[in-house]
Amino acid sequence: MATLAAFKFDTADGAEQMLDIVEGLQKQQLIDIIDGAIVTWPTDKKKPKTKQMYHTNWTGALGGAFWGMLFGLLFFIPFVGLAIGAALGALAGHFSDYGIDDNFIKQVREKVTPGTSALFLLTQNAVTDKVVDAMKHGPKLEVISTNLTKEQEDKLREEFGEEAPAHA
């Protein structure tokens, strides 16, 4: 079973600071990172900056399409017109098919705001107590997460994985 987690930080650079800790956990085989992305939202900006993470030791990237669609749904709906907003609203229902429910989306929208940042990780096989203990040594964070069933994870990989065929 995979977990999609957003590690929310009270500073715009907290997510970047946590990367070394997360990579150390991966090297110690305490967590298996499938894919990840960072959102930074400087206080003087209307919209956040997003960046997909590329690490050769992560097991299998979902690709930019997944992160682009997720971040569009999470952060850019307030900035688009009603017609596009309605289409993205329908997309929210589609994400629930992958185990990314309305509660996860709502919490991220409410908590990742100007002046904050978030490290988004899709992980599996975490040794939870050791991961939580290691993260206590980094910047203060709040965890927002949702668990995916094996079927939902497979569906995500099929739809958005690097090996996925292009849809017309």
Question: What kind of feature is each model-predicted range?
Answer:
Residues 1-117, 123-168:
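Positively charged, small/polar-rich N-terminal and surface patches that mediate targeting and assembly
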